[in-house]
């Protein structure tokens, strides 16, 4: 994983989460979570996605956000009764097989090294019920001509850096999700805030841990 000290970065990250808001709303729009579903948000950070989810007309009955950084979780807003935040790692989720109807992993996969990314995707497949939906958000190329012109130079820096710039590495995880048994059903790009790629996939995997 990119060598970002999330404990040190927690306050700064909370202040810039407005740059992620458009993509978080878009992936929730594509996912359409409902009141009779259980949702897991992996790498929830300061629970920005859960805050957006709580404002939806029909939020899920149960939502769990996990993050490796207690400092990030400490910046979460008050969430609805029955929702939960836990310290946990995306590569070893502390949940039984087929525990959730919906899962999200936003601004995570592009930060992970290949082996960790495969583990995280496999864990998401494991804890999702067959037919469950996964929404991912990763950094993607900008739409505008000026942004596209500068993007190769930005990517060259991001791929060499293991600190903050690494968070701008772009990634289309579609093929890796497909290899893990997911079937892509929709994708969308957002341009305001961080240029982002939103994917929604259906879980076709029946493989449990071990």
Placement of each model-derived feature along the sequence:
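Conserved class I S-adenosyl-L-methionine
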Residues: 1-34, 48-52
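Short glycine-centered segments of the SAM/dcSAM-binding site in methyltransferase folds
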Residues: 38, 131-133
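Class I SAM-dependent methyltransferase SAM/SAH-binding core
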Residues: 40-92
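A short acidic, Gly/Pro-enriched loop at the edge of an enzyme's catalytic core
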Residues: 91-103
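A short SAM/SAH-binding and catalytic strip from SAM-dependent methyltransferases
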Residues: 102-115
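A short glycine-rich, Lys/Arg-flanked "PGG" loop and its adjoining helix->strand segment in the class I
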Residues: 118-130
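C-terminal alpha-helical "lid/dimerization" subdomain adjacent to the S-adenosyl-L-methionine
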Residues: 137-180, 185-188
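Core SAM-dependent methyltransferase catalytic element
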Residues: 180-182, 186-210
